[in-house]
């Protein structure tokens, strides 16, 4: 579902849960609903990429399920999990910019209200540049952290 449609679709639920459907607080429910399935799918992919032989050897050595999760699955998938967090954060930046279009506040609201509606190209350029910088910083930090967990 395109996020802008999800935003509008979830207005009644947001109103019910939070008591308001606009502003930064009103954007929390749609952002959460959009981010959770994305993140869980990415983590699922990371966990599925673990070599089954590693898991099999942990089971053969008699490790309990909680121990396998803690000592095998999470460490083996940590690189992918951190990359998943990074990608989810980048998508949340994009989603939050779209939330500004429907009154969610933030940089998207600034771009629409002062850039688009007032035909202020300078403001539009600045908001686009700020979003690009924010995404690049997020990507750089995520890559820097995930490098520490990369398996050769």
Residue ranges and their predicted role:
Residues 1-6:
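Transmembrane alpha-helices and adjacent helix-loop boundaries
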Residues 47-77, 117:
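Short helix-to-coil transition segments within interhelical loops
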Residues 25-29, 33-55, 85-86, 93-97, ...:
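Membrane-embedded alpha-helices of multi-pass transport/permease systems
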Residues 8-38, 123, 127:
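Loop-to-helix entry region at the N-terminal start of transmembrane alpha-helices
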Residues 125-152:
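C-terminal transmembrane helix and the adjacent membrane-cytosol boundary/short C-terminal tail
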Residues 65-96:
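Transmembrane alpha-helices
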Residues 94-130, 150:
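Glycine-rich helix-loop "coupling/hinge" segments at transmembrane-helix boundaries
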């Amino acid at each position: 579902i395109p996020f802008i449609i999800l935003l509008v679709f979830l207005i009644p639920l947001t109103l019910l849960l939070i008591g308001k459907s606009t502003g930064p607080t009103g954007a929390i429910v749609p952002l959460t609903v959009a981010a959770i399935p994305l993140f869980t799918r990415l983590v699922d992919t990371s966990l599925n990429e673990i070599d089954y032989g590693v898991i099999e050897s942990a089971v053969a050595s008699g490790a309990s399920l909680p121990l396998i999760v803690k000592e095998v699955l999470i460490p083996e998938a940590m690189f992918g999990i951190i990359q998943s967090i990074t990608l989810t954060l980048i998508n949340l930046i994009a989603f939050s910019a779209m939330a500004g279009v429907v009154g969610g506040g933030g940089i998207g609201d600034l771009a629409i209200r002062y850039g688009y509606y007032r035909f202020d190209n300078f403001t539009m350029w600045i908001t686009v540049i700020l979003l690009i910088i924010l995404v690049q910083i997020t990507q750089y930090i995520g890559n820097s952290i995930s490098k520490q967990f990369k398996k050769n």
